[in-house]
């Protein structure tokens, strides 16, 4: 499963050894038609409200600016989940995520994260905005960033505050998501989990948080007007030096099996199990005491006219197509 995210304003109509799947296209743009201005606080929702939320796509299909698609592979159940949520708290904000489950209940974990994570992100942002109302701190509605202190935008402080706000929201929502999975009464996440690659496009700003080995790749034009691929994420594999150091410090083990030497895995200190092929994931609580974490990598990027689209994809697309 993958996603192709347009960075323009124009509208457009797992498995560690996962099987190849067709690459879907998911275009995100900003519709030019006039719509009612809405702010972040207008979009606070609960899980019970999700089925009635407009501009939220999570199955094969399309909306006014996007289309998404996933297909069953050759092995077992399709454990991928995906979401595009246009007008996410504001008319020019779009949330997009791809989640690749693994383990016996990975498909359920991925779907749970798909539904709950954006709501948690929304809740943290709304809470932060509520605290800022009436103060001279930065507030924003959609693409505009405003402050009661006029000099802030001269030295970039407004952008810094916006970046800090989104970073905090991503970190807190990922932490809350993993905590909910751990205490869920009907979902066994002990040896099951999910990756996550999530992006928020707010005007020309791109905010991204991710765990696991699902990727974000941007298509951008170089000086010769040729399209080049720019990988925006790092595959958080167990053999990355910083990841391996943390895991070993927590008494976990990292090694590859003889019959697949190219796939490093995380193992318990006292047993050759479960063999997780990533260093960060939601769930997988059997390994959380041994170095596997759910803290996301966060990044911010200012999009330019050269940036054309972004592909979000699970490992079935990245490694096998």
Can you name each region flagged by the protein language model?
Residues 2-321:
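PP2C/PPM-type serine/threonine phosphatase catalytic core
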């Amino acid at each position: 499963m993958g996603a192709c995210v347009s960075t323009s304003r124009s509208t457009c109509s797992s498995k560690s050894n996962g099987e190849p799947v067709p690459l879907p296209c998911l275009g995100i743009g900003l519709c030019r038609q006039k719509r009612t201005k809405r702010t972040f606080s207008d979009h606070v929702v609960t899980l019970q409200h999700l089925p009635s939320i407009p501009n939220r796509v999570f199955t094969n299909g399309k909306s006014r600016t996007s289309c998404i698609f996933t297909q069953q592979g050759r092995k077992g159940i399709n454990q991928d989940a995906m979401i595009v949520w246009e007008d996410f708290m504001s008319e020019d904000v779009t949330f997009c995520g791809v989640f690749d489950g693994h383990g016996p209940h990975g498909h359920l974990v991925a779907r749970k994260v798909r539904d709950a994570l954006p709501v948690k992100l929304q809740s943290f942002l709304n809470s932060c905005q509520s605290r800022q109302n009436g103060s001279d701190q930065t507030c924003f509605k959609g693409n505009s960033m405003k402050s009661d202190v006029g000099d802030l935008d001269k030295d970039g402080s407004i952008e810094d505050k916006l970046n800090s706000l989104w970073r905090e929201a991503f970190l807190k929502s990922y932490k809350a998501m993993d905590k909910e999975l751990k205490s869920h009464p009907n979902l066994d996440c002990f040896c099951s989990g999910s990756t996550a690659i999530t992006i928020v496009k707010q005007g020309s700003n791109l905010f991204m948080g991710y765990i696991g080995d699902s990727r974000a790749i941007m298509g951008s034009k170089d000086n010769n007007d040729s399209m080049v691929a720019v990988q925006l994420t790092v595959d958080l594999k167990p053999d990355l030096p910083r990841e391996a150091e943390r895991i070993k410090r927590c008494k976990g083990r990292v090694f590859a099996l003889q019959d697949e030497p190219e796939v490093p895995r995380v193992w318990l200190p006292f047993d050759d199990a479960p063999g997780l092929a990533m260093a960060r994931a939601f769930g997988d609580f059997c390994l959380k005491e041994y170095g596997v974490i759910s803290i996301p990598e966060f990044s911010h990027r200012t999009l330019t006219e050269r940036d054309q689209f972004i592909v979000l994809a699970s490992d079935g697309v990245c490694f096998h197509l």
